[in-house]
Amino acid sequence: MGSILQFVLIIITINITYVTLTTIRFILMIKGMRVYASLLSVLEVFIYIMGLSIILDNLDSYWNIAAYCCGYGVGVYLGSRIEERLALGYIMAQVIVECEYQGLAGELRDAGFGVTSWLGEGKTGPRMVMMVLAKRNRQKELLNRIDSLCSNAFVIFEEPKNFRGGFWAKKVLH
């Protein structure tokens, strides 16, 4: 029984590691970090081949197959949590506030965020509309700053795949 449990734990560990790396590699590719994704794939495929050979040599036990499946699920979850912590890339926030908060754009610029603003028209009157570009790892900071200055702001976050130009582009890209 001890060797079965030990074998199951090895399979789970290998699969968690493999799938976590796969998830991170996939996200790196989406973010345009092809070199890092390529380097990571070497380690990923090595671990995959090790795990696959172990499971194929031991298909006689349902515990091994269950361990493989459980490791896969945990690996996806763990990989997505790691990516969330890394917060790679940029976010674009569309912020809409009542016009009395016109100073918000200047406050956000002073905090190092890229802001373009213009006047818009809402259902109940004029609104200040802002597009705010920030690194994704500053998203919580941006939202906290907006909330502290204007708690009833309407905010939508998006992830731009590419952008170019603008006075702030050199600062953002490097």
Curated annotation (Swiss-Prot):
Q: Where does it reside?
A: Cell membrane
Q: Does the keyword Transmembrane apply?
A: yes
Q: Which Pfam families match?
A: DUF2179, DUF5698
Task: Say where the protein is mainly found.
Answer: membrane
**Membrane topology type, per the record?**
Multi-pass membrane protein
Superkingdom assignment: Bacteria
A single Gene Ontology CC annotation of this entry is: plasma membrane
The membrane spanning regions, by residue number, are 4-24, 35-55, 59-79
State the UniProt keywords alphabetically: Cell membrane, Membrane, Transmembrane, Transmembrane helix
**Presence of the UniProt keyword Membrane in the record:** yes
Report the sequence similarity comment from the record: Belongs to the UPF0316 family.
Q: Report what the protein is called.
A: UPF0316 protein DSY1893
Q: What is the protein's species of origin?
A: Desulfitobacterium hafniense (strain Y51)
